[in-house]
Amino acid sequence: MTKSIFEYKDDQDWYLASFGSYNHLTYFGDDEAYEQYVDFFQGLTNTLDVSGFQLHVVKHSSDLRLVSFILDCLKEELGRDLVVTQHQGTLLVSEGDKLLYVHVPREGVSLDGFFGSDNKSDFGDVLLIATRNEGKTKEFRKLFGKLGIKVENLNDYPDLPEVAETGMTFEENARLKAETISKLTGKMVLSDDSGLQVDVLGGLPGVWSARFAGPEATDAENNAKLLHELAMVLDDSKRSAQFHTTLVVAAPGRDSLVVDADWKGYIGREPKGDNGFGYDPLFLVGNTGRTAAELSTEEKNEQSHRGQAVKKLMEVFPAWQNKQ
C-alpha cells in the first residue's frame, strides 16, 4: 500500500509528514531551534497519544501553522477531530469538549489576560469582518477556523455606525474601515476594498467602481458607462485593465497588516456571461477570451484578485499575529 505524504508549503513555512513505525522529527537548522521543535513535537504527540507520526520541518515561522498542519494530518490519517484555538497568545488543542494540550510561547503570557474572562463566549481570539455579507463571512469563517480564530461580521454589531469610504486609494479605504471599527470595538478587524482599473482611463473607475455612473448606479449602468468611455478605443491591446483588491487587518496597538493582488485582463466590447456581478461580464480574463462572468464560481475564486489576496493573507497572517 502506498504511504501517504502530507505537505504544506508557502513562502514562510514548509512541512512534510508521513506515518511510519515510530514518532520522529527532523530539522536541518540550528541546534537550539531543533531542540525547541523536538520538545514541542514530543509534548504534543505524547499528549495526543499518537504513534508513528514522522515530521520534517524545512522552514518554520509560525507555531500556529505547524500545529494546524499536524492536526490536519492526524484528522486525515486517523480520523481524529482535533481543533486548535488561539487564546491570548497561546494555542489550545481540543477534541470534542476536552482540552488536551496547551502551547505557550517561550516568553510566556499574562495570567490576567489568559484567565481574565468568565464569559465563555469571550473565549478564544476573534476576527471581525467589516461586512454584512453572510456569504463572504462564511468563506472567511472557513479559512480562519483552521487557524483557531472565531469570525464575526457587522451583523453581530448592529449599533456600529457606517464608515464612509472617503479615501483616494483602495488601501486608504480598507485602512479607514478596518482601523476605525477596530478602535470602536477593540477587536481585530479585516476589511477590503476592491475595484476595476482601466489603464487607458488612468486607473478609473478605481475606488469609484461601484458608483462610476452615479451614486445609486446599477451594475448595468456602470457597464454602459464604461463601454461609452472606451467607445473610441479600437485597439484591443489598449483596453487592458485589472481588478484590484486590498485587504487590511487592524487591531488595537498594532501596525495594520496590508496585502493586495491584481487580476489582469482586458475590457470586452459587449457583456458576456451570466455569473458574477459588477464588471464581470465585460472583463476578459488574461488572454483566454472568456469573461469573468463566464467562469464558474470555483474557477473565479481560484484566479480572481480577491482569491489571490486571500491566499497571500493566509500565508502572512500567522507571522504578523505572532510578532505582536
Swiss-Prot record:
Gene3D superfamilies for the chain: 3.90.950.10
Matching InterPro entries: dITP/XTP_pyrophosphatase, ITPase-like_fam, RdgB/HAM1
Pfam families linked to this entry: Ham1p_like
Keywords, sorted A to Z: Hydrolase, Magnesium, Metal-binding, Nucleotide metabolism, Nucleotide-binding
Positions of the catalytic residues: D193
GO cellular component terms listed in the entry, alphabetical order: cytosol
Cofactor(s) recorded in Swiss-Prot or TrEMBL: Mg(2+)
Residues the entry annotates as binding Mg(2+): D193
Stretch list, region NTP pyrophosphatase: 127-324
EC annotation from Swiss-Prot or TrEMBL: 3.6.1.66
Recorded GO MF terms: dITP diphosphatase activity; ITP diphosphatase activity; metal ion binding; nucleotide binding; ribonucleoside triphosphate phosphatase activity; XTP diphosphatase activity
Gene Ontology biological process terms, A to Z: nucleotide metabolic process; purine nucleoside triphosphate catabolic process
Binding sites annotated in the UniProt record for substrate: T131, R132, N133, E134, G135, K136, S194, F277, G278, Y279, D280, K300, H305, R306
Function of the protein: Pyrophosphatase that catalyzes the hydrolysis of nucleoside triphosphates to their monophosphate derivatives, with a high preference for the non-canonical purine nucleotides XTP (xanthosine triphosphate), dITP (deoxyinosine triphosphate) and ITP. Seems to function as a house-cleaning enzyme that removes non-canonical purine nucleotides from the nucleotide pool, thus preventing their incorporation into DNA/RNA and avoiding chromosomal lesions.
PANTHER family the record matches: INOSINE TRIPHOSPHATE PYROPHOSPHATASE, INOSINE TRIPHOSPHATE PYROPHOSPHATASE/HAM1 PROTEIN
Subunit and partners: Homodimer.
Similarity-based family: Belongs to the HAM1 NTPase family.
UniProt protein name: dITP/XTP pyrophosphatase
Record organism: Streptococcus thermophilus (strain CNRZ 1066)
